[in-house]
């Protein structure tokens, strides 16, 4: 019921003959993702979906640090000629307006700078219309991670962007 199997099925149902590889690590930060980039891209890779920053946010890490790490990942993808879908997040107001402004701005700014596709908000499909809080019925008991139905909604919202990403992929990697 996780994201990768659900997205894989969604893509297959739409005729996309691709294999998704989950290079994520539970509890991962942007620093961990940046540190593992070479390893993650060591096999045949045709594109990247970068969905990092949530754990940075939970830890209250300076958005400048998260931004630098995401930039390392985007530079690494660019140097390999890989198209990227960058998945954004929005900070709550818990850390103050300056933190929120800097955190929220980094995803669209980096996507524009590196020519990445952008999904503005990973969690938007889990928010009732005209609300700013997540629908708790779509979340696991921890209140942080989406449950199977929540993942289904995220996949439905992100899927078209993933198809756009696949359209940017050249011949298959060898």
Describe the function of each predicted region.
Residues 1-2:
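Glycine- and acidic-residue-enriched helix-capping/strand-helix junction motifs
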Residues 6-16, 32-174:
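Alpha-helical cap/lid subdomain in secreted, periplasmic
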Residues 17-29:
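A short beta-strand-loop structural module common to alpha/beta enzyme folds
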């Amino acid at each position: 019921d996780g994201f990768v199997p659900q997205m894989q099925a969604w893509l297959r149902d739409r005729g996309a003959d691709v294999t998704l590889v989950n290079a994520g690590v539970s509890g991962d930060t942007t620093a961990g993702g940046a540190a593992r980039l070479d390893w993650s891209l060591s096999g045949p890779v045709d594109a990247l979906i970068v969905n990092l920053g949530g754990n940075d946010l939970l830890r209250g890490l300076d958005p400048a640090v998260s931004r630098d790490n995401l930039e390392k990942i985007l530079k690494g993808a660019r140097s390999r000629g890989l198209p990227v879908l960058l998945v954004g997040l929005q900070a709550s107001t818990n850390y103050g307006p300056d933190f929120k402004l800097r955190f929220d701005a980094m995803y669209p700014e980096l996507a524009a700078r590196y020519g990445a596709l952008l999904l503005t908000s990973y969690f938007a499909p889990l928010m009732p219309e005209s609300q700013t809080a997540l629908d708790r019925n779509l979340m696991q008991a921890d209140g942080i991670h989406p449950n199977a139905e929540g993942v289904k909604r995220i996949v439905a919202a992100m899927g078209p962007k993933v198809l756009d990403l696949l359209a940017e992929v050249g011949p298959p990697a060898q």
